[in-house]
């Protein structure tokens, strides 16, 4: 059940999300793959088939971590970064569309992510808060 502030992930909306992500990936050479997952962990869009299989597990880790953070701390946490020997994975919560953006790259810092999820919301024509 979506709250009044959440938008349903329709095929049209998912296609627009994919278009935005592909555009910014084209300008960020360090980003190798990206996916959008619903809060139930289901992958609704992925930049490639291999990441489509991996992203739901990564998203679930992020979702569980965000829930744990909310339970034990005050304040807001909207993203998590996982660093491995081969690169980094960023997990970004996108509340208005009840989703998690999962991005894999070679650098621990992916500069286009600094503007996410605000850039994604602007691309969808949605208001950006804060």
Residue ranges and their predicted role:
Residues 1-39, 43-130:
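Non-catalytic interaction/Regulatory regions outside core domains
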């Amino acid at each position: 059940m979506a709250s009044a502030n959440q938008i349903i992930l329709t095929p049209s909306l998912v296609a627009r999300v994919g278009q935005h992500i592909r555009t910014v990936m084209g300008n960020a050479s360090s980003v190798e793959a990206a996916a959008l997952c619903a809060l139930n962990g289901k992958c609704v869009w992925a930049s490639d088939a291999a990441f489509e299989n991996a992203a739901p597990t990564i998203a679930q880790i992020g979702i569980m971590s965000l829930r744990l953070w909310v339970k034990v701390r005050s304040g807001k946490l909207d993203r998590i970064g996982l660093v491995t020997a081969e690169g980094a994975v960023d997990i970004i919560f996108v509340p208005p569309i009840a989703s998690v953006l999962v991005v894999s790259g070679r650098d621990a810092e992916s500069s286009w992510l600094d503007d996410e999820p605000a850039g994604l919301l602007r691309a969808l024509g949605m208001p950006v808060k804060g």
